[in-house]
């Protein structure tokens, strides 16, 4: 019996000694929450989770003042890196118009589609509901989603289409920096339209640092390939050359404008009309000018519509026709041409 007690005492002593030894091990200090600055560095290096965490911090006062618009920017950064929680959060911002983000059902659904592809049950449910309840928005969002998926695997046409949705007038909220990224993908695939649009952004410093050398290289390639937007650029450049550059080269300008006009560019058609009217770089011809203005007007060019309407009203190079004048001036006014609005008041 004494032996059993002895064993018990030994075992308790041993255990006590073990616990006592463990008690002297310094506990691990809890990790400090990452600062906004530390997360910003990681996010800038491409860490999607850090960008998302930083967005969460900016939604609150954690680590500093709340800044919802900055939060949205970091969620967008993480969302484009395929971080599903950020895609869902950003979708909510667009669905509800939160944090200074313009309400946009199409963009909200686009991000839900990406999150659904990543396995989000919530997003899958919302996409399914949109399919049955809002087919028009679903169709547009799915078209953008498809272009984005193609762009991600290197499709030039997909990249060009997705970039267009990010530019002014696209279905997504304007994001010129992201548009430049995808235009570059398409330009590398030697797509002239992408080269022209990217070249113009470099020329104007839109969404990217201004770089005339890159602009000229891209626009030259696109123009030689027959891209009307690039041909229009070279025509304008020749038309507006400064004295230091040798002054305007009207013959060169007319050549480029004609090339672009023949491909249906309404601005080039209008400018061709201007040059015919003034005899710059070509013969002076009112009839040819009106033909060029009429082509541009038919294509929806507001200034050309005004010129055609004014010509009918005053009988300039064409038989006077008040009905035709009113028709074209009304179109021009609807397209925002103030001179057309004023002349319509005079006709009335």
Please annotate each region the language model reported.
Residues 45-47, 60-62, 80-83, 97-98, ...:
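Short helix-capping/linker turns of helical repeat alpha-solenoids
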Residues 112, 116, 123-128, 322-347:
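Leucine-rich solenoid repeat scaffolds
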Residues 1-10:
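N-terminal Sec-pathway targeting helices
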Residues 28-37, 65-74, 101-111, 135-146, ...:
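Structural signature of tandem alpha-helical TPR/SEL1-like repeats
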Residues 84-109, 270-278, 283-339:
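Ankyrin-repeat and related helical/solenoid repeat scaffolds used for protein-protein interactions
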Residues 40-42, 77-78, 114-115, 147-150, ...:
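Canonical positions in the second alpha-helix
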Residues 53-60, 89-96, 126-133, 161-168, ...:
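Hydrophobic face of amphipathic alpha-helices that form TPR/SEL1-like repeat modules
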Residues 9, 13-56, 128, 132, ...:
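N-terminal leader/linker segments that initiate helical-solenoid repeat arrays
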């Amino acid at each position: 019996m004494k032996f059993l007690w002895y064993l018990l005492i030994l075992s308790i002593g041993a255990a006590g000694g073990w616990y006592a030894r463990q008690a002297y091990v310094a506990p691990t200090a809890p990790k400090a929450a990452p600062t906004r600055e530390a997360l910003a560095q990681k996010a800038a290096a491409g860490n999607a989770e850090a960008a998302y965490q930083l967005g969460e911090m900016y939604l609150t006062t954690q680590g500093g003042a709340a800044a919802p618009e900055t939060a949205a920017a970091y969620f967008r950064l993480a969302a484009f890196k395929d971080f599903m929680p950020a895609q869902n959060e950003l979708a909510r911002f667009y669905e509800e118009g939160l944090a200074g983000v313009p309400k946009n059902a199409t963009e909200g659904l686009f991000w839900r589609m990406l999150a659904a592809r990543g396995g989000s049950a919530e997003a899958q449910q919302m996409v399914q509901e949109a399919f049955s309840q809002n087919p028009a928005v679903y169709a547009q969002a799915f078209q953008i989603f498809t272009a984005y998926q193609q762009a991600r695997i290197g499709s030039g046409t997909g990249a060009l289409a997705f970039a267009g949705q990010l530019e002014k007038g696209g279905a997504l909220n304007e994001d010129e920096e992201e548009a430049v990224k995808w235009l570059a993908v398409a330009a590398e695939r030697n797509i002239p339209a992408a080269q022209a649009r990217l070249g113009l952004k470099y020329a104007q410093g839109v969404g990217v640092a201004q770089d005339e050398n890159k602009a000229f290289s891209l626009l030259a390639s696109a123009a030689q390939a027959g891209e009307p937007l690039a041909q229009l650029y070279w025509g304008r450049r020749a038309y507006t050359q400064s004295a230091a550059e040798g002054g305007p080269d009207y013959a060169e300008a007319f050549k480029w404008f004609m090339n672009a006009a023949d491909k249906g560019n309404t601005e080039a058609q209008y400018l061709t009309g201007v040059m015919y009217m003034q005899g710059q770089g070509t013969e002076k011809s009112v009839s040819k000018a009106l033909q060029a203005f009429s082509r541009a007007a038919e294509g929806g060019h507001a200034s050309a519509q005004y010129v055609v309407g004014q010509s009918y009203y005053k009988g300039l190079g064409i038989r006077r026709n008040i009905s035709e004048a009113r028709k074209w001036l009304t179109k021009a006014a609807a397209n925002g041409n103030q001179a057309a609005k004023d002349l319509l008041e005079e006709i009335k």
